[in-house]
Amino acid sequence: MTIQYTFSMIKPDVIKRNKIGQVNTYLENAGLKIVAQKMKFLTKYEAECFYDEHRARPFFNSLVEYITSGAVVLQVLKGEDAITLNRIIMGATNPAEAKEGTIRKDLGESIEANSIHGSDSENSAKREIKFFFSKSEIIE
């Protein structure tokens, strides 16, 4: 097994319902260590740049509007096979299709308001971590 870093973003629906701690408990109980975390409001420009790979998709504008509708919590997670492990504990994108006991099944409200974003590959993790965090913000 390989120790990896991955990126996670707790979405506005979770923040508004005061469930940040609950999400962190899922992550930590799965064996992931939170090595960086900060809360912020994304600007429209930041959201557009972050989700640039989806720019041509029909849901892009709605996604940007949603993710800028409230605060988000940005995180760097560390652990054995952290990218895959985080994807498993998050659950399927659509909460209605997610397995019981996953973050999205238990806390997600819709495909868009599905509680959490997580990197889907090593390249995505590197890009997404670098987008929001400097090396000095990641505490080992």
Curated annotation (Swiss-Prot):
For this record, the Gene Ontology CC terms, alphabetical, are:
cytoplasm
Main localization is: cytoplasm
Kindly state which reaction or reactions the protein catalyses.
a 2'-deoxyribonucleoside 5'-diphosphate + ATP = a 2'-deoxyribonucleoside 5'-triphosphate + ADP; a ribonucleoside 5'-diphosphate + ATP = a ribonucleoside 5'-triphosphate + ADP
Check the record and name the CDD domains matching this protein. Answer: NDPk_I
| Known EC number | 2.7.4.6
The signal peptide stretch is: none
Q: What class of enzyme is it?
A: transferase
Does this entry carry the keyword Manganese?
A: no
Q: Which GO terms describe its biological process?
A: CTP biosynthetic process; GTP biosynthetic process; UTP biosynthetic process
Active site positions, chain numbering: H117 (pros-phosphohistidine intermediate)
Residue positions binding ATP: K11, F59, R87, T93, R104, N114
Known cofactor(s): Mg(2+)
The lineage's top-level taxon is Bacteria
Places the protein is found: Cytoplasm
Recorded GO terms, molecular function?
ATP binding; metal ion binding; nucleoside diphosphate kinase activity
**What are the record keywords, sorted?**
ATP-binding, Cytoplasm, Kinase, Magnesium, Metal-binding, Nucleotide metabolism, Nucleotide-binding, Phosphoprotein, Transferase
> Which PANTHER family has this protein been placed in?
NUCLEOSIDE DIPHOSPHATE KINASE, NUCLEOSIDE DIPHOSPHATE KINASE DDB_G0292928-RELATED
Similarity section: Belongs to the NDK family.
Assembly and oligomerization: Homotetramer.
Which protein, by its recorded name, is this? Nucleoside diphosphate kinase
